[in-house]
Amino acid sequence: MNLRYLSYLLYIVLMITGVNAYAAETLEPVAKKGQVIVIYRGPCPSGKTKAAMRKIEKIISYERKNSPVSYSSSPGNWEDGQVGAVDLHASQSAMEKAFAWQESDKKWSKMYDDVAKIC
């Protein structure tokens, strides 16, 4: 009985090791060559993170409808209490164009400031 138990245990360990090795070999990079990832993070008191996240989601929705530069953005809520977003831009140039639009768009700037006020 003990030999059978040890055989099963060894089989499970080998299988888990194989699955982990396979997962490591098949993970795809988050960004392709030339793309740029931008992470926005800021501290936010625990009682205010939900309100801040709702506002960040509204900013992302506004960006999708109004930005002249297309990019992907997802809200982020980190375990250490920080909130923000992760953006994926097609290139350095596209990121700079998005930043220029954000700086010049009064509504976007106000929404961004509102998140800072919440936190």
Q: What is each of the regions a protein language model found here?
A:
Residues 1-9:
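Bacterial N-terminal signal peptides that target proteins for export
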Residues 22-110, 116-119:
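Short S/T/G/P-rich N-terminal loop/turn motif that feeds into the first structured element of a domain
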Residues 1-2, 15-16, 22:
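Intrinsic-disorder-linked linear interaction elements in eukaryotic regulatory proteins
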